[in-house]
Amino acid sequence: MELVDPNLDPWNHPGSQPTTPCTRCYCKWCCFHCYWCFTTKGLGISYGRKKRRQRPRTPQSSQIHQDFVPKQPISQARGNPTGPKESKKEVESKAKTDP
């Protein structure tokens, strides 16, 4: 094994840099191209700031298609509003006639 000059920084050692530049390709060969390609492409790790994709905004003129729903009147209670009272009367009258 060759001795490396101790005055050189580790990233400047011979063989530390690949001979070809990094590409945007995600094939197996390019994912193992160098340490950076392996971590970002192969493992999907990036420590940089993540950009949020914004949805394309609709122009103001497209508000026409959004019709407002008219206010509905408050619905009445379901069923017969005097239902329980009448049913009690019916039960009482049936009970009186069956002695």
UniProtKB/Swiss-Prot annotation:
Coiled coil: none annotated. Zn(2+) 2 binds at C25, C27, C30. There is a cross-link at K71 (Glycyl lysine isopeptide (Lys-Gly) (interchain with G-Cter in ubiquitin)). The record marks W11 as: Essential for Tat translocation through the endosomal membrane. Keywords: Acetylation, Activator, AIDS, Apoptosis, Host cytoplasm, Host nucleus, Host-virus interaction, Inhibition of host innate immune response by virus, Inhibition of host interferon signaling pathway by virus, Interferon antiviral system evasion, Isopeptide bond, Metal-binding, Methylation, Modulation of host chromatin by virus, Modulation of host PP1 activity by virus, Phosphoprotein, RNA-binding, Secreted, Transcription, Transcription regulation, Ubl conjugation, Viral immunoevasion, Zinc. Pfam families: Tat (PF00539). It is found in: Host nucleus, Host nucleolus; Host cytoplasm; Secreted. The keyword Transcription applies. Asymmetrical arginine methylation by host PRMT6 seems to diminish the transactivation capacity of Tat and affects the interaction with host CCNT1. One of its GO terms (biological process) is symbiont-mediated suppression of host innate immune response. One of its GO terms (molecular function) is trans-activation response element binding. GO terms for cellular component: extracellular region; host cell cytoplasm; host cell nucleolus. Zn(2+) 1 binds at C22, H33, C34, C37. The modification Asymmetric dimethylarginine is found at R52, R53. Residues 85-99 have a biased composition (Basic and acidic residues). Interacts with host CCNT1. Associates with the P-TEFb complex composed at least of Tat, P-TEFb (CDK9 and CCNT1), TAR RNA, RNA Pol II. Recruits the HATs CREBBP, TAF1/TFIID, EP300, PCAF and GCN5L2. Interacts with host KAT5/Tip60; this interaction targets the latter to degradation. Interacts with the host deacetylase SIRT1. Interacts with host capping enzyme RNGTT; this interaction stimulates RNGTT. Binds to host KDR, and to the host integrins ITGAV/ITGB3 and ITGA5/ITGB1. Interacts with host KPNB1/importin beta-1 without previous binding to KPNA1/importin alpha-1. Interacts with EIF2AK2. HIV-1 lineages are divided in three main groups, M (for Major), O (for Outlier), and N (for New, or Non-M, Non-O). The vast majority of strains found worldwide belong to the group M. Group O seems to be endemic to and largely confined to Cameroon and neighboring countries in West Central Africa, where these viruses represent a small minority of HIV-1 strains. The group N is represented by a limited number of isolates from Cameroonian persons. The group M is further subdivided in 9 clades or subtypes (A to D, F to H, J and K). Transcriptional activator that increases RNA Pol II processivity, thereby increasing the level of full-length viral transcripts. Recognizes a hairpin structure at the 5'-LTR of the nascent viral mRNAs referred to as the transactivation responsive RNA element (TAR) and recruits the cyclin T1-CDK9 complex (P-TEFb complex) that will in turn hyperphosphorylate the RNA polymerase II to allow efficient elongation. The CDK9 component of P-TEFb and other Tat-activated kinases hyperphosphorylate the C-terminus of RNA Pol II that becomes stabilized and much more processive. This is Protein Tat. It comes from Human immunodeficiency virus type 1 group M subtype F1 (isolate 93BR020) (HIV-1).
